[in-house]
Amino acid sequence: MNIEQFRAKSVDDLKAHLIELRKEQFSMRMQLAMGQFQKTHEIRRVRRNIARVKYVLSWINRASA
């Protein structure tokens, strides 16, 4: 997803998506540690999406303050 798609979502949707991404990241890290994970580029994608969601949430908080 790109930043514009995240900005179009509500705060509750963003928070739910952030939790979902963190669960996915945790699962990937565990699979990587066990040697079962092959698509290491997906870890980078998830990490960057987490950063995008957190940025949009802080952007919304600053705009409303």
Curated annotation (Swiss-Prot):
PROSITE patterns: RIBOSOMAL_L29
Top-level taxon of the source organism: Bacteria
Database matches in InterPro entries: Ribosomal_protein_uL29, Ribosomal_uL29, Ribosomal_uL29_CS, Ribosomal_uL29_sf
GO biological process, one term: translation
GO MF annotation terms: structural constituent of ribosome
Any one Gene Ontology cellular component term annotated for this protein: cytosolic large ribosomal subunit
UniProt entry tagged with the keyword Thylakoid: no
Gene3D superfamilies in UniProt: 1.10.287.310
Pfam families: Ribosomal_L29 (PF00831)
Signal sequence residues: none
Keywords, sorted A to Z: Ribonucleoprotein, Ribosomal protein
Similarity remark: Belongs to the universal ribosomal protein uL29 family.
Record protein name field: Large ribosomal subunit protein uL29
Organism: Xylella fastidiosa (strain 9a5c)
Source organism phylogeny: Bacteria, Pseudomonadati, Pseudomonadota, Gammaproteobacteria, Lysobacterales
Gene of this entry: rpmC
